[in-house]
Amino acid sequence: CPACAQRLESRQLKMGDRKRLVCVGCGNVLYLDPKVAVGTIIAMADTRIVMVRRAIEPGYGLWVFPGGYVDRGEVVSTAAVREAREEAGIDIRLNGLVSIYSYPDRPPVIIVYAATAITADLRHDDESLEIATFSESEIPWEALAFRSTREALRDYYDGVLHPHCC
């Protein structure tokens, strides 16, 4: 227990609810909150989008758009801009929200933005094997790392955009 250092046990607090971790000493309920992640579909001046090939698990060697976890206390849109700079080496302007993706029994909630590149000098970081730009027809659909990557790209190309969110 983070409050009193006693042992936690799994208990069902209310009929029909999922089990929660509860401290046997002080009764504190430990809620296992989801992680919040951001991704950014970045269009270059020629409308090609930026993708990176992962150098880390999960999804080693597979393609994603730049993204990562939101730090505690960080504004989600700020995290999207930061991750684009870290993973692609470019500055971006957010154009709006594509959508939010979550899946049963998966901890991350993924918030995906559409963006335009402000700078054009792409460079990948140590979390990526390479960086490239793709037209819609060139995207390596069979080599995408995550379900959320596929769904967000399909939504993006279908014109899904909520422009007043950032």
Descriptions of predicted regions:
Residues 9-12, 91-98:
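A short coil-to-beta-strand element that immediately follows conserved catalytic motifs
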Residues 33, 101-123, 152, 157-160:
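Active-site-adjacent beta-strand/loop module that shapes the phosphate/pyrophosphate-binding cleft
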Residues 9, 105, 124-166:
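Nudix hydrolase/Nudix homology domain
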Residues 42-43, 51, 115, 133:
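Conserved hydrophobic "DFG−1" position in protein kinase catalytic cores
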Residues 2-40:
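Acidic, metal-coordinating catalytic segment for phosphate/diphosphate chemistry
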